Amino acid sequence: MEPRTVAEAVETGKEDVIMEALRSYNQEHSQSFTFDDAQQEDRKRLAELLVSVLEQGLPPSHRVTWLQSVRILSRDHNCLDPFTSRQSLQALACYADISVSEGSVPESPDMDVVLESLKCLCNLVLSSPVAQMLAAEARLVVKLTERVGLYRERSFPHDVQFFDLRLLFLLTALRTDVRQQLFQELKGVRLLTDTLELTLGVTPEGNPPKLLPSQETERAMEILKVLFNITLDSIKGEVDEEDAALYRHLGTLLRHCVMIATAGDRTEEFHGHAVNLLGNLPLKCLDVLFTLEPHGDSVEFMGVNMDVIRALLIFLEKRLHQTHRLKESVAPVLSVLTECARMHRPARKFLKAQVLPPLRDVRTRPEVGEMLRNKLVRLMTHLDTDVKRVAAEFLFVLCSESVPRFIKYTGYGNAAGLLAARGLMAGGRPEGQYSEDEDTDTDEYKEAKASINPVTGRVEEKPPNPMEGMTEEQKEHEAMKLVTMFDKLSRNRVIQPMGMSPRGHLTSLQDAMCETMEQQLSSDPDSDPD
């Protein structure tokens, strides 16, 4: 049915005609997410008619059908204006049972009406900055969190819980003030941690399920996303003992999340949200990842259960198969693994054994191949700065931040970026709490070590001498051509001669020479003023 026909039916004021037209329109467009521009004005007209009745109040028997029509029209970005007034948003909040206005909430709300209203609010908040502002001003987050807190005591339909959490996610993703309000005033981390525990089915008496059902998976992912939003900018520096205990409890739930599967094909997506949130936890709270007692089926290393680390490595390998949005895909899990390796010696040694096993193939460049080491070394020269930084940082920590060892596994050419950023181009080792790990060399590596090109990280075939057969005059001529080419590139600022500062940083050759001269003058007693 065309929107013009529906609008004309609404204008008749006849209840049976209106409801028949709306039901027909809803059925026809239930899966419509794109709209014909030619009917745009008709849809706007219909939206205005629906809103006028919505704000005045709907008869209980008509609410679901009416709200379904509002939901369909709220998908059209060109029809949002009628729905984004303060009055219409307040009406939707009342029907969703999340209005903070006194006396505006029915005692026993119809859950079908609540659900349709939540869907309308989600559409509006997603697409309209005005709706986002009005929702924040109306403090919808307060009533939403109150209802979320009742999930343990009362039974709510899955869809209502899901869209409660989806609306919380949208508000916290799009409004900084709502994030802060949920984190501080409403104690959102504790509330949502308890809700996550309930959703996962974790109880002190028994083991949680190893396979999370589809509905619980959907709700758990929304909870993880909201927790990520409110902890992203809020957890800075040290936390007190009470907060540390809360974050450790959340960490144990996330540990469980990365080790279970979900119904359907959403396991990797679920793990991704858990890993993202792990990266927001205070570093000292990541120790809960290693508190599981070893058992018969677990991966044990140096007396520590490494099941979580193995699960994170498997997740990393899956993400490395992706070719797009690598920053979002691999940076979070690499950051978590890096911090685990930095703070926990058994974890670092286990990861090094898995990622950087003793070198045997010394004739292949480190970035060539399908081993995990090869894939990570390739990322060290990725176009995205954040991707190459986290990949290099991870491998550097696995090498106990030893420059020679880092170059050995990656090649100087691949390692140069991190070494330059760290001021380690001249070698050395930064300050860090690392024990002197043994780095056992294989017989193959020992035999070929003297022939390995440190820049490429492999044994190179000796190239032919390009000057073989040349006279001295020809050699001098070629050398002068090379000098002229470099001079031209330098004058045109295509390249810039670089030198090494005393602190190991790359700097322009001119600055390096000036610094050297200044040091010589300052150390020369004859240069002191009279």
Swiss-Prot record:
It is found in: Cytoplasm, Cell cortex; Cytoplasm. The modification Phosphoserine is found at S435, S501, S522, S523, S527. One of its GO terms (cellular component) is cytoplasm. The modification Phosphothreonine is found at T440, T442. It comes from the Eukaryota. Pfam families: Ric8. InterPro entries: ARM-like (IPR011989), ARM-type_fold (IPR016024), Chaperone_Ric-8_A/B (IPR008376), Gua_nucleotide_exch_fac_Ric8 (IPR019318). Phosphorylated at Ser-435 and Thr-440 by CK2, stabilizing its interface with G alpha proteins. GO terms for molecular function: G-protein alpha-subunit binding; guanyl-nucleotide exchange factor activity; protein folding chaperone. Transmembrane segments: none annotated. Keywords: Chaperone, Cytoplasm, Guanine-nucleotide releasing factor, Phosphoprotein. The keyword Chaperone applies. One of its GO terms (biological process) is G protein-coupled receptor signaling pathway. Belongs to the synembryn family. Chaperone that specifically binds and folds nascent G alpha proteins prior to G protein heterotrimer formation, promoting their stability and activity: folds GNAI1, GNAO1, GNA13 and GNAQ. Does not fold G(s) G-alpha proteins GNAS nor GNAL. Also acts as a guanine nucleotide exchange factor (GEF) for G alpha proteins by stimulating exchange of bound GDP for free GTP. Interacts with GDP-bound G alpha proteins GNAI1, GNAO1 and GNAQ, and with GNA13 with lower affinity. Does not interact with G-alpha proteins when they are in complex with subunits beta and gamma. Interacts (via C-terminus) with RGS14; the interaction stimulates the dissociation of the complex between RGS14 and the active GTP-bound form of GNAI1. Interacts with NCS1; interaction is favored in the absence of Ca(2+) and myristoylation of NCS1 is not required. This is Chaperone Ric-8A. The gene is RIC8A.
